[in-house]
Swiss-Prot record:
Transmembrane segments: none
Protein name, UniProt field: Guanylate kinase
Source organism of this protein record: Staphylococcus epidermidis (strain ATCC 35984 / DSM 28319 / BCRC 17069 / CCUG 31568 / BM 3577 / RP62A)
E.C. number: 2.7.4.8
Family, per entry: Belongs to the guanylate kinase family.
Protein encoded by which gene: gmk
UniProt-annotated binding residues for ATP: 13-20
Localization: Cytoplasm
């Protein structure tokens, strides 16, 4: 039977919900076989982040040059910074049969949905907006004004969870990781994803 094309797994949610933490937990698991699609951004590197591992960090000028070159699946501006997903790596990796894991902001996920309607969209939600505020304050990296801006944005983003296939509440990182892995495993077993392969196999048997 032909190799199954990989899934594009899109993990999205409000800033501060713990997308990066959950993603790291998933990739620390030795059973994980997904390939991570590293996003590009113009925001400042946070303590502990590594260029080319967590993000590709670019200047605004570099990023805008890549936009003109049509080098992104999606890009968006969020709280004054650009975020984007380089396109070629994603396409090539999926064709090789690997699942590609993409961690992006909500605005970017909307663009991906238009270009990759068959992708798997998972919304990572906070237990509450108060919990989200506490996480943002706990980072100790932003002013009260910027934190309030992110919480206000999160309110709008939570209202858009109906655009996603699944919602995972990040009340505990290990549980969120397990839920996401279970969703991906189940998605591979969906009839629509394998029916075409079997139809082709049956046609070849008849020849």
């Amino acid at each position: 039977m032909d190799k199954e094309k990989g899934l594009l797994i899109v993990l999205s949610g409000p800033s501060g919900v713990g997308k990066g933490t959950v993603r790291k937990k998933i990739f620390e698991d030795p059973t994980t076989s997904y390939k991570y699609s590293i996003s590009m951004t113009t925001r400042h590197m946070r303590e502990g982040e590594i260029d080319g591992v967590d993000y590709f960090f670019k200047t605004k000028e570099e990023f805008e040059a890549l936009i003109k070159d049509d080098q992104f699946i999606e890009y968006a501006q969020y709280v004054g910074n650009y975020y984007g997903t380089p396109v070629q790596y994603v396409k090539d990796t999926m064709e090789e049969g690997h699942d590609v894991f993409l961690e992006i902001e909500v605005e970017g996920a909307k663009q991906v949905r238009k270009k990759f309607p068959d992708a798997l969209f998972i919304f990572l939600a906070p237990p509450s907006l108060d919990d989200l505020r506490e996480r943002l304050v706990g980072r100790g990296t932003e002013s009260d004004e910027k934190i309030q801006s992110r919480v206000n944005e999160a309110r709008k983003e939570v209202e858009m969870m109906n655009l996603y296939d699944y919602v995972v509440v990040n009340d505990e990182v290990e549980l969120a990781k397990n839920r996401i892995q279970s969703i991906v495993e189940a998605e591979h077993l969906k009839r629509e994803r394998i029916e075409a392969k079997y139809r082709k196999m049956l046609l070849e048997v008849k020849k």
